[in-house]
Amino acid sequence: KANSGELRLDAERIGISGQSSGGHLAMLSAMRPFDSRYSSIPLDADMPDVDACVRCVGMSWPVINPLSRYRYALQERKNEAEWVGDIPECHDLYWVTDKNMIDGNPVCALENGETVQRPPAIWIQGRPDPVHDYLDPESELGIKEPERFAQRYREAGGDIEVLYIKQTERDSRASFDPLAAFFRKYLG
């Protein structure tokens, strides 16, 4: 937004998008645009005074709940699931503690009643996808994470669509076209 003039953009028509961990970060930053932890690098004095609010969020198979995904990966490693790879070690390296995974967690923010921004959102989810579309056994809802987040987001007053596509079509128009239509709808 601060460079919108130079980039010839309308600062009021900014959306954000990401895949997997990037989808998690997109939603987290969209929900907490005024959180000082996410704006600790000051803008140059000659830059316009802007906020980090976005008009909409597009997510593709996000790691929306880092803690449940971490625990799920540890459990599935015991079952020798090939997809697990080094996911737990990467979580340990990035997050360090469970407390951090809770703090940086859009699902926990909603379930804990945190006051957050709720821009319109879309979640594109491939199926079958054991890495992102799974059931957290600790959830009271008994539904997989995409639907859990969507339900909590709606309960908080947000508008979100969850669109399921074939896992084999994630890198195709089946994924890209709905995102493009979503951004056209909200950004004009």
Regions found by a protein language model. Give the residues of each.
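Primarily recognizes the serine-hydrolase "nucleophile elbow" in alpha/beta-hydrolase
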Residues: K1-L74
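Serine-hydrolase-like catalytic core of hydrolytic proteins
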Residues: K1-G15, P119, S139-E145, R152-Y153
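C-terminal catalytic histidine-bearing segment of alpha/beta-hydrolase fold enzymes
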Residues: I122-P137, I143-G188
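Surface-exposed acidic, glycine-flexible loop patches that form ligand/cofactor-binding
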Residues: G5-R8, D46-D51, C108-Q117, L187
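Mobile cap/lid helix-loop segments that gate and shape the active-site cleft of serine hydrolases
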Residues: P33, S39-S40, S68-G113
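Stable alpha-helical elements in mature extracytoplasmic
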Residues: S21-L25, V50, P106, E145, ...
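Short, proline-enriched alpha-helix->beta-strand connector loops that line the catalytic pocket
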Residues: V50-R55, E114-I122, A156-D159
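Hydrophobic anchor at the start of a short beta-strand
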Residues: I14, T97-K99, A121, I160-E161
